């Protein structure tokens, strides 16, 4: 076997192709997703493991930088093809070696471990991980990069068609899906920059009205378009009388589709387009031959309750996050500064505003 680190596009393309059809894969380590952190001044790289010129594993790492502090973060993984789980320990050793090379004070990785049969192909179980990781602790001390911690699974069971599957949904869900289609929505897929920007405005508006944050379109645009152009995602748009009333952004990876974000126009009566958007994603998933759909973790209490209506099985990975402190002095200094800033947040915000005005 051969392993090497790379940022060359040819190898990044091969890495992405591997993740797309690898059950343990995640969109969080697609090269385009890793590149999106460059807008924050972060760097990235990919470790690839080859056997007879075939990619069988690796990991995607983000090198996060804050002042003079550096952190080496793997949002999901290491990832290996089934049958090569014994290589995980050696890949974890590579995380430490590589992080030290970059003078990082801290390294972190997140493994999808679960005993749930319903997602057994998408996860590792403890019997696959043959040894403990030396000098590695359970937990997550760096919280500025989203890392996988579970999967919110909509299983298609033995359904042979969307019609079979919808019959297993509750009466309420079936009714609301039918109500959404009664408004004769036009279902399209945003493809161009202009189409995506217009559709994404609804996501930004929902975030503003709901008092939560999403990345701006300008910040995420490059990632969006690259994923679309390489057929790794879907941006579903529902229009009524030519106006955008509902949107949903979904990424294809690991032999399933994951819901990333979406938005609907608030109308009276409710157009029920949230149900329609997810139903369209489920139909695409079934058409691709997938066995389930990841409606995604998290959200407000209302969003979580809405997702649960699709007969979800919310699976939290078992102690997913692991970390290594590589330079205790520097890392403790970082923690201290974080505490100081958190306790004096209003002061630092005012200071930042003053500096901007003076400029």
Question: Which residue ranges define each predicted feature?
Answer:
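A conserved beta-strand-loop-helix scaffold within acyl/acetyltransferase catalytic domains
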Residues: 2-68, 113-120, 124, 136-269
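The substrate-binding groove and active-site-proximal loops of carbohydrate-active enzymes
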Residues: 77-83
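Active-site/acyl-donor-binding loops of N-acyltransferases
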Residues: 35-36, 63-65, 114, 121-162, ...
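Flexible glycine-rich active-site/ligand-binding loops centered on an Asp-His dyad
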Residues: 74
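Aromatic (often tryptophan-rich) hydrophobic motifs at membrane interfaces
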Residues: 82, 89-98, 221-332
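Conserved GNAT acetyl-CoA-binding A-motif
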Residues: 100-113, 118, 285-296
């Amino acid at each position: 076997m051969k392993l090497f680190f790379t940022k060359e596009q040819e190898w990044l393309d091969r890495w992405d192709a591997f993740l797309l059809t690898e059950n343990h894969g995640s969109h969080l380590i697609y090269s385009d997703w890793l590149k999106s952190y460059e807008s924050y001044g972060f760097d990235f790289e990919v470790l690839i493991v080859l056997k007879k010129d075939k990619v069988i594993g690796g990991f995607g790492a983000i090198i996060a930088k804050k002042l003079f502090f550096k952190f080496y973060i793997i949002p999901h993984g290491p990832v290996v093809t089934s049958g090569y789980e014994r290589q995980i320990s050696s890949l974890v050793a590579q995380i430490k070696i590589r992080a030290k090379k970059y003078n990082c004070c801290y390294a972190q990785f997140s493994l999808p471990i679960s005993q749930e049969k319903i997602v057994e192909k998408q996860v590792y179980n403890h019997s696959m991980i043959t040894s403990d990781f030396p000098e590695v602790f359970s937990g997550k001390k760096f919280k500025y990069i989203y890392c996988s911690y579970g999967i919110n699974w909509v299983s298609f069971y033995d359904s042979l068609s969307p019609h079979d599957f919808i019959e297993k949904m509750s009466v309420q869900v079936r009714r609301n899906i039918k109500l959404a289609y009664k408004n004769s929505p036009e279902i399209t897929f945003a493809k161009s920059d202009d189409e995506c920007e217009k559709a994404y405005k609804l996501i930004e508006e929902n975030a503003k009205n709901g008092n939560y944050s999403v990345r701006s379109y300008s910040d995420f645009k490059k990632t969006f378009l690259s994923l679309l152009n390489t057929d790794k995602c879907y941006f579903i748009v529902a229009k009524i009388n030519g106006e955008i009333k509902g949107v949903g952004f979904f990424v294809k990876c690991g032999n399933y589709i994951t819901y990333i974000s979406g938005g609907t126009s608030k109308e009276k009566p409710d157009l029920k387009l949230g149900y329609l958007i997810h139903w369209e994603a489920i139909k695409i998933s079934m058409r691709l031959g997938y066995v389930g759909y990841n409606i995604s973790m998290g959200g407000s209490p209302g969003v979580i309750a809405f997702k649960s209506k699709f007969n979800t099985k919310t699976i939290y990975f078992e102690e997913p996050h692991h970390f290594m402190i590589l330079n205790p002095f520097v890392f403790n200094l970082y923690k201290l500064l974080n505490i100081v800033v958190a306790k004096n947040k209003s002061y630092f915000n005012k200071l930042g505003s003053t500096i901007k005005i003076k400029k």
